[in-house]
């Protein structure tokens, strides 16, 4: 208690906590922007990469394990990112969302570019022969090769979408 017996009023939260810094709209309006459309494409194409690599039975786990990790992780984080904007939580969480958007898309772009290169390298090993105890057989059969070609194409398209999102995020972060 103060000397006068009155309790000081609590601080105004609007003064204590600055408003979040975000230039993208929250709620369903995010889907009407280029960034929202790219995030939706990233989710769909990244899911296809994940499904295609998994359906090839991962014949080269050293190379394709990283591709699976990146595609699954990026898929779920992109869903979380889109969910935060669709639910409007970005307006209630004090953060520089423009900077976080840029950092997220930069990291995922770098990782997805590496995953694309590894998937392309795994696909290029189609004609490589593998010695077993009885016979010599190709490392990838024709079905696995076709699936890996499709996964490589979709990994490239997903990488391009993350690159476009990175460019848009850079423009928002540094106008």
UniProtKB/Swiss-Prot annotation:
<feature type="transmembrane region" description="Helical">
    <location>
        <begin position="66"/>
        <end position="86"/>
    </location>
</feature>
<keyword id="KW-0812">Transmembrane</keyword>
<feature type="topological domain" description="Cytoplasmic">
    <location>
        <begin position="170"/>
        <end position="175"/>
    </location>
</feature>
<feature type="transmembrane region" description="Helical">
    <location>
        <begin position="34"/>
        <end position="54"/>
    </location>
</feature>
<keyword id="KW-1003">Cell membrane</keyword>
<keyword id="KW-0472">Membrane</keyword>
<protein>
    <recommendedName>
        <fullName>Protein MAL2</fullName>
    </recommendedName>
</protein>
<feature type="topological domain" description="Cytoplasmic">
    <location>
        <begin position="1"/>
        <end position="33"/>
    </location>
</feature>
<feature type="topological domain" description="Lumenal">
    <location>
        <begin position="55"/>
        <end position="65"/>
    </location>
</feature>
<feature type="transmembrane region" description="Helical">
    <location>
        <begin position="149"/>
        <end position="169"/>
    </location>
</feature>
<feature type="domain" description="MARVEL">
    <location>
        <begin position="30"/>
        <end position="174"/>
    </location>
</feature>
<dbReference type="GO" id="GO:0016324">
    <property type="term" value="C:apical plasma membrane"/>
</dbReference>
<comment type="similarity">
    <text>Belongs to the MAL family.</text>
</comment>
<dbReference type="Pfam" id="PF01284">
    <property type="entry name" value="MARVEL"/>
</dbReference>
<feature type="topological domain" description="Lumenal">
    <location>
        <begin position="123"/>
        <end position="148"/>
    </location>
</feature>
<feature type="transmembrane region" description="Helical">
    <location>
        <begin position="102"/>
        <end position="122"/>
    </location>
</feature>
<comment type="function">
    <text>Member of the machinery of polarized transport. Required for the indirect transcytotic route at the step of the egress of the transcytosing cargo from perinuclear endosomes in order for it to travel to the apical surface via a raft-dependent pathway.</text>
</comment>
<dbReference type="GO" id="GO:0045121">
    <property type="term" value="C:membrane raft"/>
</dbReference>
<dbReference type="InterPro" id="IPR050578">
    <property type="entry name" value="MARVEL-CKLF_proteins"/>
</dbReference>
<keyword id="KW-0325">Glycoprotein</keyword>
<comment type="subunit">
    <text>Interacts with TPD52L2.</text>
</comment>
<dbReference type="InterPro" id="IPR008253">
    <property type="entry name" value="Marvel"/>
</dbReference>
<feature type="topological domain" description="Cytoplasmic">
    <location>
        <begin position="87"/>
        <end position="101"/>
    </location>
</feature>
<keyword id="KW-1133">Transmembrane helix</keyword>
<feature type="glycosylation site" description="N-linked (GlcNAc...) asparagine">
    <location>
        <position position="131"/>
    </location>
</feature>
<dbReference type="InterPro" id="IPR013295">
    <property type="entry name" value="MAL"/>
</dbReference>
């Amino acid at each position: 208690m103060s000397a006068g017996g009155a309790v000081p009023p609590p601080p105004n939260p609007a003064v204590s906590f600055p408003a979040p810094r975000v230039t993208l709209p929250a709620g369903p309006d995010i889907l009407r922007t280029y960034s929202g459309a790219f995030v939706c494409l990233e989710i769909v194409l990244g899911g296809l990469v994940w499904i295609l690599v998994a359906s090839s039975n991962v014949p080269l786990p050293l190379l394709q394990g990283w591709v699976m990790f990146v595609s699954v992780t990026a898929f779920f984080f992109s869903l979380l990112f889109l969910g935060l904007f669709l639910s409007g939580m970005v307006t209630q969480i004090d953060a520089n969302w423009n900077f976080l958007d840029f950092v997220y898309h930069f990291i995922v772009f770098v990782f997805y570019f590496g995953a694309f290169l590894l998937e392309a390298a795994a696909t290029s090993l189609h004609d490589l022969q593998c010695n077993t105890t009885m016979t010599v057989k190709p490392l990838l059969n024709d079905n696995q090769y076709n699936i890996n070609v499709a996964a490589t194409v979709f990994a490239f398209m997903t990488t391009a979408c993350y690159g476009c999102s990175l460019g848009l995020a850079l423009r928002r972060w540094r106008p």
